[in-house]
């Protein structure tokens, strides 16, 4: 099965299934000398892990990461970093009734047709359970970016169903179960999710990720543009159906005189481009948004087929997130960090000695 490795110089290869013994990953390309510990990685894993609120799946996994290699006396050695997270709360019997039936909207049918068989327990390899390792690996990248470059990556919920969140206060985001940056929206979110759970249904969401203190120059045109790789990374997250950089699809209604980010000696006048021009970071905040579909694992009956092609009714049991977008916030942060780490190393390898006669202008003032 191909497609398990991400990145060019800073790479992550993952393995494992939802109801297997464990999930794991191997990071290659991390520079030596980075101070890192399991506690560093656990911070974001605790933000992502299931069973921490009534708005997410009841599956309870401690998600305690083990660093198996590549770290000695608290510092990276420059060799492969092995990561492992054991699965401890599987309930495979919850899926016994669907082992011969395809859940509509899931990867059951496509995995069966591609490989001729599938691990039906919790979705197997297609489950978002795998993303825990991405979050752990992203913790390594985030630590390097922050300590060596001053780059900080932060995500938040920007829309859940019909509830739009415009105000962004990053100090609020991690104080609530929704990763919502606007405290005034919490009651509405809570009421909406309570009603949704009573209906046995699910809802989609929009998640935004921002990297601040960005340098100019990250991105490898033509085919490995920074925004192209970010879109690739975000689309690789389970349930993501759309990605925007900067103003994204809103640019359809903008005129050129409105959209272009004007510049002066004092800096940029706006950031509609989301911090990327020509596939290269401009030094402005890097802004990415992604849309996540509602999960199809719901108790509302739905029509499907079985492995023999016969019509069947499906009612999904088991423990599932009524809105997968909520726990996607730390996952999106991790994927952005992995992309930035990879592009920083690529830029350093080719252009470390490049000097431009043009001064770097400031990002748009907040």
Swiss-Prot record:
Pathway: Metabolic intermediate biosynthesis; chorismate biosynthesis; chorismate from D-erythrose 4-phosphate and phosphoenolpyruvate: step 7/7. GO terms for biological process: amino acid biosynthetic process; aromatic amino acid family biosynthetic process; chorismate biosynthetic process. It comes from the Bacteria. NADP(+) binds at residues 48, 54. Reduced FMN (FMNH(2)). Coiled coil: none annotated. Its EC number is 4.2.3.5. Its cofactor is FMNH2. It catalyses: 5-O-(1-carboxyvinyl)-3-phosphoshikimate = chorismate + phosphate. GO terms for cellular component: cytosol. It holds the Pfam family Chorismate_synt. It is an enzyme of class 4 (lyase). This reaction introduces a second double bond into the aromatic ring system. NCBIfam families: aroC, PRK05382.1. Belongs to the chorismate synthase family. Homotetramer. This is Chorismate synthase.
């Amino acid at each position: 099965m191909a497609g398990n490795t991400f990145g060019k110089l800073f790479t992550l290869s993952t393995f494992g299934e939802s109801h297997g013994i464990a999930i794991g990953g191997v990071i290659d390309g991390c520079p030596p000398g980075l101070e890192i510990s399991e506690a560093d990685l656990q911070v974001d894993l605790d933000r992502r892990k299931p069973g921490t609120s009534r708005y997410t799946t009841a599956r309870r996994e401690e998600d305690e990461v083990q660093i198996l290699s590549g770290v000695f006396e608290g510092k990276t050695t420059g060799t492969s970093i092995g990561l492992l997270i054991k699965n401890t709360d599987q309930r495979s019997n919850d899926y016994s009734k669907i082992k011969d039936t395809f859940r509509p909207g899931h990867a059951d049918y496509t995995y069966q047709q591609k490989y001729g068989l599938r691990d039906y327990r919790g979705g197997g390899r297609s489950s978002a359970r795998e993303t825990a390792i991405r979050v752990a690996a992203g913790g390594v990248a985030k630590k390097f970016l922050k300590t060596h470059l001053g780059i900080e990556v932060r995500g938040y919920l920007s829309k859940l169903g019909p509830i739009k969140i415009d105000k962004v206060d990053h100090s609020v985001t991690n104080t609530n179960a929704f990763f919502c940056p606007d405290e005034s929206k919490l009651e509405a979110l809570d009421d909406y999710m309570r009603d949704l759970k009573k209906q046995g249904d699910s809802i989609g969401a929009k998640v935004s990720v921002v990297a601040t203190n960005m340098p100019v120059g990250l991105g490898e045109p033509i085919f490995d543009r920074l925004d192209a790789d970010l879109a690739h990374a975000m689309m690789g997250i389970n349930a993501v159906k759309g990605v925007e950089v900067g103003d994204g699809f809103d640019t359809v209604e903008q005129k050129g005189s409105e959209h272009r980010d004007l510049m002066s000696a004092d800096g940029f006048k706006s950031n509609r481009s989301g911090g990327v021009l020509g596939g290269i970071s401009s030094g402005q905040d890097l802004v990415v948004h992604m849309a996540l579909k509602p999960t199809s694992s719901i108790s509302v009956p739905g029509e499907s087929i079985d492995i023999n092609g016969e019509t069947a009714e499906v009612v999904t049991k088991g423990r599932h997130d009524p809105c997968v977008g909520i726990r996607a916030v730390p996952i999106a942060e991790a994927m952005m960090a992995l992309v930035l780490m990879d592009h920083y190393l690529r830029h350093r390898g080719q252009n470390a000695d490049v000097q431009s006669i043009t001064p770097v202008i400031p990002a748009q003032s907040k």
